[in-house]
From Swiss-Prot:
This is Cytochrome b. It comes from Malayopython reticulatus (Reticulate python). It is found in: Mitochondrion inner membrane. Its cofactor is heme b. GO terms for molecular function: metal ion binding; ubiquinol-cytochrome-c reductase activity. Heme 1 (or BL or b562) is low-potential and absorbs at about 562 nm, and heme 2 (or BH or b566) is high-potential and absorbs at about 566 nm. A ubiquinone binds at H193. Binds 2 heme b groups non-covalently. Signal peptide: none annotated. Heme b b566 binds at H89, H188. Belongs to the cytochrome b family. The chain crosses the membrane at residues 25-45, 69-90, 105-125, 170-190, 218-238, 280-300, 312-332, 339-358. SUPFAM superfamilies: a domain/subunit of cytochrome bc1 complex (Ubiquinol-cytochrome c reductase), Transmembrane di-heme cytochromes.
Length: 371
């Protein structure tokens, strides 16, 4: 075994010749993770987890710390880039049937949940107006849990309201969870390379494989360069594009913002939550909007793996994509007609996609046998 065996392992990794650009997002996610850990460390050095000083410490980072503004913007916009990549990565897995590699899919969805928790805790840390109220609304959902709800909420807050202990523990969780993400990512990659990645045709590629390096590594590097370039263009010219104007004001528990909403990457789940007028029902729908992804490997009934040759399933998939975008857009709007109706219709369509998977598979199998 050579002394640089890990590099050799990745270099000689056998990969299907026909994987497309959609398979590049794994390496892009790894880059995002490295960037987030690095910038997060430099921010944590200057951040103060105290409700009286947190907002001021962010101002201090952006104004007084050398290149602090860049670190802060890279970390905030890097999170958005992370979610763009992970949503495309999941969509590719859905489209090309990668979920049939069950262990890899399960570890990937666990990764998504951990990432969402990390991002939520991070959004609270600047202690701006929207940070505070988003944290209040989302953590309040725990009160919907029968019998234990109030105790759970008090335990999470560290008191009877969101206060100093809440911010301290959220900072601790935001610091520790990325290490869980790194561990899960390693497990995800190990499980993936145990069976090998899928390909656009959904066939067994064992007879036609090439080394990962140099063929696919250069292909990955192209999209990676475009992503980093986009990131730096946004950081330099449009740093506040994903920010909420309310978050430029310090948290004030006495003043409620006109429209409370989380970061854009949670809006689809928040839109589903808001579309149900019952608190427990909304909380369950919110949890199920992510958890339902775990069921997909078990509901696949089609003879073909990818959607490449499945027109019915393709139609449903692109309906899901447009539904996802519409829920996200509707969740940015106030809770009033017609946005309530739009949210309810799109939420129903979102869950319909996952429920219809086995029936579509059976229907397509039947049509193929008829032909």
């Amino acid at each position: 075994m050579p002394h640089h065996y890990i590099l050799t392992l990745f270099g000689l990794l056998p990969v299907a010749t026909n994987i497309s650009t959609w398979w590049n997002f794994g390496s892009m996610l790894l880059t995002c993770l490295a960037l987030q850990v690095l910038t997060g460390f430099f921010l944590a050095v200057h951040y103060t987890a105290n409700i009286n000083l947190a907002f001021s410490s962010i101002i201090h980072i952006t104004r007084d710390v050398p290149y602090g503004w860049m670190m802060q913007n890279l970390h905030a916009i890097g999170a958005s880039m992370f979610f763009i990549c992970i949503y495309i990565h999941i969509a590719r897995g859905l489209y090309y049937g990668s979920y049939l590699n069950k262990e890899t899919w399960m570890s990937g969805i666990t990764l998504l949940i951990t990432l969402m928790a990390t991002a939520f805790f991070g959004y609270v840390l600047p202690w701006g107006q929207m940070s505070f109220w988003a944290a209040t609304v989302i953590t309040n959902l725990l009160t919907a849990v029968p019998y234990l709800g109030t105790s759970l909420t008090t335990w999470l807050w560290g008191g009877f309201a969101i206060n100093d202990p809440t911010l301290t523990r959220f900072f601790a969780l935001h610091f520790i969870l990325p290490f869980a993400i790194i561990s899960l990512s390693s497990l995800h990659v190990i499980l993936l390379h145990e069976e090998g990645s899928s390909n656009p045709l959904g066939t067994n590629p064992d007879i036609d494989k090439i080394p990962f390096h140099p063929y696919h590594s250069y292909k990955d590097f192209l999209l990676l360069t475009l992503m980093v370039l986009s990131l730096f263009i946004i950081v330099s010219f449009f740093p506040d594009i994903f920010n909420d104007p309310d978050n430029f004001s310090k948290a004030n528990p006495l003043v409620t913002p006109q429209h409370i909403k989380p970061e854009w990457y949670f809006l689809f789940a928040y839109g589903i939550l808001r579309s149900i007028p019952n608190q427990l029902g909304g909380a369950l729908a919110l949890v199920m909007s992510i958890m339902i992804l775990f069921t997909i490997p078990f509901t696949h009934t089609a003879n073909l793996r990818p959607m490449t040759f499945r027109p019915l399933y393709q139609l449903m998939f692109w309906t899901l994509v447009s539904t996802f975008i519409t829920i996200t857009w509707a969740a940015t709007k106030p809770v009033e007609p017609p946005f309530i109706t739009i949210s309810q219709v799109t939420s129903t369509l979102y869950f319909t996609f996952f429920i219809s998977i086995p029936f579509l598979g059976w229907m397509e199998n039947k049509m193929m046998h008829l032909n």
